[in-house]
């Protein structure tokens, strides 16, 4: 099942990206003002998994659709390379932008990235008034390095040869359909009545650790009120 293997590979790669971003967020924003222990790093990654899985489900959809088509149609390697590189580039740039913005702005705003950031798109000067040119250059450099690093990693896992059409195409399609259902459940947040939401990862009375598990790519489209919920008020 070559197609299923590539799907699992992309899912795990993107999931690891979101999980790995959390220790970096803690490292940058921790310190005397926001103390934490090694056990807190593990807890943050663990409690953040539901939103990481949901966000990964969204991010893996372009790969999923291509692999579903590839079961029935033999796609030329050139087409695969172009498609993967376009998707990889978009994901690398967008995720780098979200991760760097979330990490940097938290030190100023004291809450995770959410819809508030869109208030500054048309008036960026207001957000940069207290930022020195050197600091701004450092942020731009961090974004460029992060985007480049993500792209290099993602590009290493693109198909290096033409994906063969599956011999048992109907069975393979049914299996991929099942995987699509699992992706939907991950995006939804499980089989319960409540769907995935920012508050589902809150676990601590310590505000910094309370916010740290939130996936900024998931919380970005949410309203400011949802992104600044108080501890244990997610029910």
Model-found features: residue ranges?
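Catalytic domains that recognize anionic headgroups
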Residues: 235
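Transmembrane and membrane-interface helices of multi-pass
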Residues: 2-229
């Amino acid at each position: 099942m070559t197609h299923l293997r590539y799907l699992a590979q992309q899912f795990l790669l993107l999931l690891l990206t979101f999980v790995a971003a959390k220790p970096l967020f803690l490292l940058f924003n921790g310190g005397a003002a926001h103390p934490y222990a090694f056990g807190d790093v593990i807890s943050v990654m663990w409690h953040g998994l539901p939103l990481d899985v949901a966000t990964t489900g969204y991010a893996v959809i372009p790969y999923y659709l291509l692999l579903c088509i590839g079961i029935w149609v033999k796609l030329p390697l050139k087409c695969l390379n172009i498609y993967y590189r376009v998707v990889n580039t978009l994901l690398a740039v967008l995720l780098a932008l979200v991760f760097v913005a979330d990490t940097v702005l938290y030190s100023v705003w004291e809450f995770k990235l959410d819809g508030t950031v869109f208030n500054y798109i048309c008036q960026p000067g207001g957000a940069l008034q207290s930022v020195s040119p050197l600091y701004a250059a450092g942020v731009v450099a961090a974004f460029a390095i992060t985007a480049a690093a993500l792209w290099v990693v993602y590009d290493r896992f693109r198909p290096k040869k033409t994906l063969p059409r599956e011999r048992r195409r109907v069975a393979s399609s049914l299996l991929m359909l099942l995987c699509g259902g699992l992706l939907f459940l991950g995006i939804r947040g499980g089989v319960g009545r409540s769907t995935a939401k920012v508050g589902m990862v809150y676990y601590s009375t310590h505000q910094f650790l309370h916010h740290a598990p939130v996936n900024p790519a998931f919380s970005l489209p949410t309203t400011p009120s949802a992104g600044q919920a108080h501890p244990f008020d997610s029910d």
